[in-house]
């Protein structure tokens, strides 16, 4: 059991049988009475947000989550298939659950899959992925309509802004946390 003083951003709790992650946290101590802990939380299954205020005497149950190393195998329609690296069991995760992570998945990529009650609820990708540029419009020197970036599309269909020197066929490194360009990869 956790007490209210253990609450912090990023902590995963079991609230009414569902896993929640604390995304914002505020502590206040009024002149009289107990300290109050105000938590903004996100349901890790539905994505719904919840704001609750707790007293210092409240107790909490840590969410029973399990993380497993898995390998992405392939996608088929709306399903993305993964294999457990330890026992070789296979499972699929829907496109809706993966969200924008689908743009960074590559065949045979190792990922961490988070489970709650033996059901996958989230994946953690490597921080950086290298993807090939499949479409890059030419950049016109002297185009002063804004910043010195241009839109491109990579092999997975993801679109982003990159410096003008990036050309079609180049491999680039992308930060999976932000979806932004990091550097061009030497081939």
Swiss-Prot record:
GO biological process, one term: peptide biosynthetic process
Pathway as given in its UniProt record: Protein biosynthesis; polypeptide chain elongation
UniProt entry keywords in alphabetical sequence: Cytoplasm, Elongation factor, Protein biosynthesis
Main location: cytoplasm
Subcellular location: Cytoplasm
One Pfam match: Elong-fact-P_C
UniProt keyword Protein biosynthesis, yes or no: yes
GO function terms (MF aspect): translation elongation factor activity
InterPro entries in alphabetical order: Elong-fact-P_C, NA-bd_OB-fold, Rib_uL2_dom2, Transl_elong_fac_P/YeiP, Transl_elong_KOW-like, Transl_elong_P/YeiP_cen, Transl_elongation_fac_P, Translation_prot_SH3-like_sf
Cellular component per GO, a single term: cytoplasm
Annotated function: Involved in peptide bond synthesis. Stimulates efficient translation and peptide-bond synthesis on native or reconstituted 70S ribosomes in vitro. Probably functions indirectly by altering the affinity of the ribosome for aminoacyl-tRNA, thus increasing their reactivity as acceptors for peptidyl transferase.
Similarity field: Belongs to the elongation factor P family.
PANTHER family: ELONGATION FACTOR P, ELONGATION FACTOR P (EF-P) FAMILY PROTEIN
Protein name per Swiss-Prot or TrEMBL: Elongation factor P
């Amino acid at each position: 059991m956790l007490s209210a003083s253990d609450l912090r951003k990023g902590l995963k709790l079991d609230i009414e049988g569902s896993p929640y992650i604390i995304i914002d946290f505020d502590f206040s101590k009024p002149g009289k009475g107990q300290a109050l802990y105000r938590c903004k939380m996100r349901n890790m299954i539905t994505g719904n947000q919840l704001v609750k205020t707790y007293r210092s005497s409240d107790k909490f149950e840590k969410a029973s989550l399990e993380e497993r190393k898995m390998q992405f195998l392939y996608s088929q329609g709306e399903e993305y298939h993964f294999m457990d690296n330890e026992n070789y069991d296979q499972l699929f995760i829907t496109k809706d659950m993966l969200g924008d992570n689908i743009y960074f998945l590559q065949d045979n990529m190792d990922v961490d899959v988070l489970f709650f009650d033996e059901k996958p609820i989230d994946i953690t990708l490597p921080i950086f992925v290298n993807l090939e540029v499949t479409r890059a419009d030419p950049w016109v020197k002297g185009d002063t309509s804004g910043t010195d970036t241009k839109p491109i599309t990579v092999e997975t269909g993801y679109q982003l802004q990159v410096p003008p020197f990036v050309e079609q066929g180049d491999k680039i490194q992308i930060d999976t946390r932000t979806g932004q360009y990091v550097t061009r990869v030497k081939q």
